[in-house]
Design a protein with these regions (language model features):
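Bacterial N-terminal signal peptides
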Residues: 15-26
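Bacterial N-terminal signal peptides that target proteins for export
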Residues: 3-16
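Carbohydrate-interacting regions of secretory-pathway proteins
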Residues: 28-249
Length: 249
């Protein structure tokens, strides 16, 4: 008898995973899982873009592009001035129960005014708000962030860490309000490929995996509370998006 994730692993094809090429597993029924390719390798027609300071739908500087069949994030048209123009590219449909997988690597240097923390830093945003609901100058969608990081050559820097813009969650029996929590992943230096998977089961359990190993788990993702409450509205699902934080990926 296979566990849910063991069964999933038997049907993963590495050939489906290109630079930031998303694969989504929908449904948790007992039958054989089936993968759905989110990025078609040709264009961005199934995706919506929101960059800080620009209206939804405007791909400033051709930030998000398709290169040789891969989804690429680049800032070569920014004139070396990022100006905190954080961006996100959203898949057209929301999801609740799924396993999403990507392989990523970093391909260049960030603009000179990029934040230090954003060096070799990207992320998958899950259970997020829609791009249409974001304000013009909003940095990040309310969501759960699965960080995609690369080592900087200075100490340890795990990947698949958990950050929570506009959200909180439960871990080890208590509500966590700390913005970012480090995973147990090792550091990946250089421009090597790294595989990250996220298993999301609605508003219950979420787990991050790096190269097949579980590195962090938590539950009950929820919006930040209001009116003095301790808990917020549970997130049963939402948008999936990929960041642009100044690191070419």
């Amino acid at each position: 008898m296979y566990s849910f994730r063991q069964m999933i692993n038997r049907f993963i094809s590495p050939s489906l995973l290109l630079i930031l090429c998303f694969v989504l597993l929908t449904g948790c029924a007992p039958q054989t899982p089936e993968w759905q390719q989110l990025f078609n390798g040709k264009d961005l027609k199934d995706w919506k873009i929101k960059i800080r300071g620009f209206p939804e739908g405007e791909n400033f500087g051709n930030t998000f592009r398709v290169v040789d069949g891969n989804l690429q994030i680049n800032y070569d048209q920014y004139n070396d001035a990022f100006k905190q123009q954080y961006g996100h590219i959203f898949y057209k449909k929301p999801y609740s129960y799924y396993l999403i997988a990507t392989e990523y690597r970093f391909i260049g240097e960030q603009p000179s005014d990029g934040e230090g923390w954003a060096k070799r830093n990207n992320g998958i945003m899950i259970h997020g708000q829609t791009p249409e609901s974001m304000t013009l100058d909003q940095d990040f969608p309310n969501s759960i962030e699965v960080q995609l990081l690369g080592g900087t050559g200075e100490g340890e820097r795990p990947t698949a860490n958990l950050c929570s813009p506009g959200t909180q969650y439960v871990r080890d029996g208590g509500i966590v309000t700390t913005h970012c929590v480090t995973s147990s992943s090792k550091t990946y230096n250089g421009d090597q490929w790294v595989r990250v998977e996220v298993l999301a089961l609605g508003d219950s359990i979420i787990k991050h995996y790096v190269n097949g190993e579980e590195v962090i788990a938590y539950e009950n993702p929820q919006l930040d509370p209001i009116n003095g409450e301790k808990t917020g509205k549970l997130l049963t699902g939402g948008t999936i998006s990929l960041q642009s934080e100044s690191a070419p990926t």
